Design a protein with these regions (language model features):
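Low-complexity, acidic interaction segments enriched in glycine
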Residues: 55-190
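Secondary-structure transition/capping residues
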Residues: 29, 49, 53, 155-156
Length: 190
């Protein structure tokens, strides 16, 4: 009887561990196909043009440039800027848009993530260009922070959590008490 209970315990442990591995793989796939794809588009645009993607809100790449992402950009504008220099924008996902993705959290809650390019300040540095992600569930933010920065504090490195529009950097909240943060930002190097 004891042997049977031990075997059942091992099987249950393997199932639980398997679910964790599957969730981790889903999070890495979302990071690579969504956030990393836009970061790569930003870097490729800069390497090809010497300019910041989204520095102007005109689709034909004309207009005044100041080295900061314009905060009133549309997805169509970003995609047009990429195509104007021969670059393909990231592929649309299941939502039909390259700027939104859906994520199912471990508790079953569905989230819609939306990215935009912004110039922001969070009180710790001068303005910086970033990819801002709205609708970020805490568990996914922690996973992305770990993937990008190899730590998960939300306040350091290039992937951060913020408390509000222009708000300060914050530590990732406890997943069991706070399911989402206002926004997460991937700080771009230039």
């Amino acid at each position: 009887m004891a042997i049977v209970l031990i075997i059942i315990g091992i099987i249950i442990g393997a199932v639980v561990k398997g679910k964790d591995l599957i969730r981790s793989a889903e999070q890495k796939k979302l990071y690579n196909q969504f956030l990393s794809a836009w970061e790569l588009a930003y870097v490729n645009y800069y390497e090809r043009t010497g300019r910041i993607l989204g520095d102007t809100n005109t689709p034909d790449n004309s207009g005044t440039r100041d080295g900061r992402c314009a905060n009133d950009l549309t997805l169509a504008n970003l995609e047009a800027q990429l195509r104007a220099v021969g670059l393909d924008p990231p592929a649309p996902g299941p939502t039909g848009s390259s700027a939104t993705r859906r994520y199912s959290a471990s508790n079953g809650t569905q989230y819609t993530l939306t990215i935009s390019f912004r110039s922001r300040s969070d009180g710790t540095a001068s303005n910086y260009n970033c990819i801002e992600i709205l609708g970020m569930p805490t568990e996914l933010g922690i996973a992305f922070d770990r993937i990008k920065d190899e730590e998960m504090d939300g306040t350091a490195g290039s992937f951060i959590a913020v408390s509000g529009n222009g708000g300060p950097r914050i530590a990732w909240p406890n997943v069991t008490t706070s399911q989402t943060v206002f926004a997460a930002r991937l700080i771009l190097g230039f």
